[in-house]
Each structure stands twice: as structure tokens, then as C-alpha cells.
Amino acid sequence: MNYLVIDTSSRCLYVGIRRGKEVLEDFSQDCSLQHSQVLISKIDALVKESGCPLAEMDYFACCAGPGSFTGIRIGLTTVRAFGQIFQKPVLTVNSLWLKAYNVEAAGVAVPLIGAVRGKFYCGAYLNGKELEKPRMVESAELEIFLKDIEQKSGLPAYVIYEGGPDGIRRLEPPKKPFYIEACDEL
């Protein structure tokens, strides 16, 4: 199976092409939310480098949020267009689950995505399983959310966020995301 995966839901753009379990080509870069200026040229370059044309993709996948509304629209529009043109299915993935999937934690993974006005999108995951549905929390509520997760699970909660509030236990996201590997779980 061949598939194209993109993530435009955050500052970092990710594009990957995979054949079965083999990553043929991938690209990840902080594009400062300028995905529309970079996405198509990066897809074109990766298709050429991989030797796997879009017409040979078995499906197209992208992150459907939460995250940057405009970024999500760019990603969804791109994969839906490819899906219609090549008559192939389109898959979407929750951005929070994907961030948690890619990090091994000795407890509960709590990915955060910055929202507006000091708020965060967050969820809680243990070994790829959702413990708490994605939600938006105020910055002041975050510590309460983490303590609640720890109390319910009996395990420490680790925040996955670049930077993040001080004084909380956290893991840095991988420097090079392995988002494409989560496709096996879909």
C-alpha cells in the first residue's frame, strides 16, 4: 500500500510518502503557519524523489485537528482534492492522538496544542488509547486537568508540548515527527 500523509495542523509542516512499512520520503519543517506557500511544492518534490506518483497512492491522510483552523483547511482541501482526482479514500487523524502516539511515556501522555487567549487543546492517552476526549482548557485549569488524569489513572501525566507552562512534568515532542508510522494503527 502506498500513501501520502500530511500534517498542517500546527506550525510544523509534515509531508510523508510510505510504501507498506517503508518510509520512502518525508519532510518536516517549522513553516510558521505558512503551509499554503510550501505544501504543494514539497509534495511534488517528495513524489519525484520517491518515484511513487500520486496516481499510485492507495489513500491520502491528514490531521483533522485540533489545531490551526486555516492549516487544517489547507491539509483537508489538499487530500480531498487528491482523493477526488485519483478516486482514492481520504483518512483523517486527530492531531492530539498523533502527538501522543509518537512519544513513549512512563505514564499518561497529555499532548497540548496552543489555542487562542492562553487556552490549550488537550487530551490524555495511555499506550495509544484515549483516556480523556480532546477538549480546550484555560491555562489556569491545566494543572487541575493533569492532577485529575493522574488521580484517575494512578500514573504520572507527561505533557507533550514545545515549551509549555513552567512547573509541569513534560516531554519534548520528537525533533523529527514519525507521524507517518501511526497510519498502521488506522
Task: Name every feature range the model reports, one short phrase each.
Residues 38, 73-74, 171-172:
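Generic recognition of short, well-ordered alpha-helical segments
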Residues 59-90:
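DPxDG-like acidic metal-binding loop motif
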Residues 46-50, 85, 103:
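Stable alpha-helical structural segments in soluble proteins, enriched in small hydrophobic residues
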Residues 14, 70, 168-169:
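Glycine/Thr-rich phosphate-binding loops of Rossmann-like dinucleotide-binding domains
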Residues 38-41, 77, 81, 98:
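Short amphipathic alpha-helical face segments that pack within enzyme cores
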Residues 1-64:
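N-terminal beta-alpha supersecondary unit
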Residues 22, 89-186:
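Surface "functional belts" at beta-alpha junctions
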